[in-house]
């Protein structure tokens, strides 16, 4: 019924939750009549949710069923074990279990809403056919009757692993799923762009990356191997991963570790730096080629307290990255002596 009401005025409602925040997205037509109706519905949902008992029960059942199904999948098992090994008791290391969801009642949801969905902690980003004055009016209208709760306290700092660890979990899957990595960095870290370039060379650049050359091209251990850094308000994970035949799992782990270690020790070549920077600079327009992508970038800038000219200076920041900066960033954010490794499905 709710989504039909949005569809009737040509609007779409979306949202999501990650380790740091919940988000609610509204996409609407620019015409005043449809826009205002959609905005009124959106505001009603945000400011006066009633959390009906029957809907809560239905959603709990849906989430529990999804969790139980996911818990049988090797990629989910690997991800949960890796996250727990990396972050321990920190909130970033928590994954919901069916019994956690089962205990939630309507009072819990209402209390969480009243303490975490206040105007003080909200970030509102708007893009489209509107004046600045209109945007300010819309933002004021959206935030006006949100709960008057204090801004939630920031999460505690992440504790780093004290030693390297390797966890092996049996599973009947035909392939072994491998994850390894280390806590990476916060989004506002000065090393963001050097590590961004370094990761592109190591495993973020697809078929031109070091990991693909060593794992796939030279040894045929996997079709795909990758790495990425996922910075949050606190230090997020740096992850390298792949799938391979079970009989090759030991070799694959060894090759990944050696490739990452060599890259951290010696850094990229001049040729790799030139190619990576050119690809990232030339690919920047694809990050902002739609209103949706621009909105996501603007919201991220506001949420992470980044400079307002972040998008304007993005390419210049990439151009300015030196090989020495990449080398220093890799050594500062990847400690091979404390690397976490998880293998699901190994013999």
Residue ranges, per PLM feature:
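An aromatic/glycine/proline-enriched structural segment found at the starts
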Residues: 92-93, 119, 123-188, 343-347
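Mature hydrolase/peptidase catalytic cores and their serpin-fold inhibitory cores, especially
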Residues: 316, 325-328
């Amino acid at each position: 019924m709710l989504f039909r009401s949005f569809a009737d005025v040509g609007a779409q409602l979306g949202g999501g939750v990650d380790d740091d925040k919940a988000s609610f997205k509204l996409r609407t037509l620019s015409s005043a009549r449809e826009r205002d109706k959609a905005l009124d519905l959106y505001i009603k949902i945000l400011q006066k949710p009633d959390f009906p008992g029957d809907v809560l029960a239905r959603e709990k059942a849906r989430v529990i069923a999804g969790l139980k199904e996911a818990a049988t999948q090797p990629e989910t098992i690997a991800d949960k074990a890796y996250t727990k090994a990396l972050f321990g008791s920190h909130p970033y290391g928590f994954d919901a279990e069916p019994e956690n969801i089962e205990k939630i009642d309507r009072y819990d949801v209402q209390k969480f809403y009243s303490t975490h969905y206040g105007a003080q902690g909200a970030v509102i980003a708007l893009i489209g056919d509107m004046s600045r004055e209109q945007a300010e009016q819309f933002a004021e209208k959206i935030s006006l009757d949100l709960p008057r709760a204090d801004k939630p306290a920031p999460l505690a700092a992440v504790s780093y692993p004290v030693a390297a660890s390797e966890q092996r979990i049996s599973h009947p899957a035909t392939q072994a799923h491998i994850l390894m990595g280390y806590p990476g960095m916060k989004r506002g870290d000065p090393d963001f762009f050097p590590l961004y370039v370094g990761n592109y060379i190591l495993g973020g650049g697809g078929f031109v990356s070091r990991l693909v050359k060593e794992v796939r091209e030279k040894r045929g251990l996997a079709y795909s191997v990758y790495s990425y850094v996922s910075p949050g308000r606190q230090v997020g994970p740096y992850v390298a991963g792949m799938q391979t035949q079970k009989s090759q799992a030991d070799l694959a782990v060894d090759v990944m570790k050696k490739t990452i270690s060599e890259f951290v020790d010696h850094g990229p070549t001049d040729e790799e730096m030139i190619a990576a920077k050119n690809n990232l600079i030339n690919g920047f327009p694809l990050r902002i080629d739609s209103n949706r992508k621009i909105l996501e970038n603007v919201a991220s800038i506001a949420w992470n307290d980044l400079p307002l000219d972040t998008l304007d200076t993005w390419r210049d920041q990439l151009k300015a990255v030196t090989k020495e900066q990449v080398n220093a960033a890799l050594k500062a954010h990847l400690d091979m002596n404390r690397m976490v490794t998880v293998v699901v499905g190994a013999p």
